[in-house]
Amino acid sequence: MQEVVTGKRAELLSAEFLKKNNLTIICKNYRIDGGEVDIIARDGHYWVFCEVKFRDDESFAAVIEQIQPQQCRRIRYTARHYLLSNNIDEHTAAIRFDVIAIVGQPTKIEWFKDAF
């Protein structure tokens, strides 16, 4: 149960961080069969699909390394579904896949734009 609470807190911190950096949050926890995107946002003309990762005691690099190719495929699949469901042409839309890494206590946030 603690992991779920921590994950939700990390997603809230990430959304606030993105807002402070002038992104518009469109959707949180977009789920379909076979995938989920933690945060969907707009950064100017970009559609940004964010994966949020939290670890108590690891470096930012270690957190990024934990994102496996299969997870990237699922996020891309889910992003494509979102775009198609909202009549957004995936071939002409500006799309970016970012990672927000939150590490340590007290927490530090690192934003990896165009991470995969």
From Swiss-Prot:
Pfam families on file: UPF0102
InterPro entries: Restrct_endonuc-II-like (IPR011335), tRNA_endonuc-like_dom_sf (IPR011856), UPF0102_YraN-like (IPR003509)
Gene Ontology molecular-function annotations: nucleic acid binding
Similarity field: Belongs to the UPF0102 family.
Protein name: UPF0102 protein IL0423
Organism of provenance: Idiomarina loihiensis (strain ATCC BAA-735 / DSM 15497 / L2-TR)
